[in-house]
Curated annotation (Swiss-Prot):
It comes from Picosynechococcus sp. (strain ATCC 27264 / PCC 7002 / PR-6). This is Probable dual-specificity RNA methyltransferase RlmN. NCBIfam families: rRNA_mod_RlmN (TIGR00048). The gene is rlmN. [4Fe-4S] cluster binds at residues 111, 115, 118. Signal peptide: none annotated.
Amino acid sequence: MPQDVLLGKSLPELTDWIETTGQPAYRGKQLYNWLYQKGIHDLSEITVFPKAWREQMGTYPVGRSQIHHQRTAPDGTRKYLLQLHDGLIIETVGIPTEKRLTVCVSSQVGCAMACDFCATGKSGFTRHLQAHEIIDQVLTVQTDFQQRVSHVVFMGMGEPLANLEQVLKSIQSLNQDIGIGQRSLTVSTVGVPDQIRALAQQNLQITLAVSLHAPNQALRESIIPTAVHYPIEALLDECREYVAITRRRLSFEYILLAGVNDLPDHAAELAKKLKGFQSHVNLIPYNPITEVPFQRPGKKRINVFKQILQDHKIAVSVRYSKGLEADAACGQLRSNLRRSAPATVK
């Protein structure tokens, strides 16, 4: 965004800014609270500020998006298409459970990783999101649910480590300004050379989830074309460095594709690869999409794969994506809308 925006600024930065508008420094704290706690879209909403100031500054960009489309699944999951200042559309998902509210945020418009099984990858890459555009997604969900967001996962559109600078800025704000603990933040990556190492140097207590999806290089390249530039052994070496530096357990994500990477031999090979790792494996049965021919394995095949990992002392669980009825798996709702008539803004 060419013009400066307020969302993403710290309390000292907002205090400095408010003084440039002719207001006393204490107004900075008020602005900070209205921005991050009340989630305003417009400065004219700040009723504790003088009317003349609100009229003068009402059009100054806060940095909020508009909800272009929203869909709710029977399980309560809410999928949002958010329209950015330049008209581009991104996806966000709010996932409620009994004691928490998790937001799945996007870090890019589209994605350059081009994973064969991902709807977002089929749409190509447009641009990186700025930090405030990531923070905005969390505030949007928090306001819509009228419930405090407890967890944020960077598992929406885009490759977070390809946009590391803005992702780190958003993490700082989510932690310090919105009050979400670092251990409640998860960054997912398919792997970008040297960026896991760069993330480790930040000394954060977040969770890193590595999208592995295959036990060997050849199979990984066949479903993740960009993996040709990042051999699986180099990826795992960086993962070991990450654990050594951060003392944090890794998560490995593994999407199960029927007949592709879900065979018993694949499970045994994966167990061998991850032996000795301080990690947990999340097995994710595939969410079918219209653009690609992959299918979800049956429950028996899933359970056999899981049992083989357990027999090799690998910590593992099966994670079923919520919100399938709302096309909430990454990329699905946006892709479906692009094939249909434009949705009514609401």
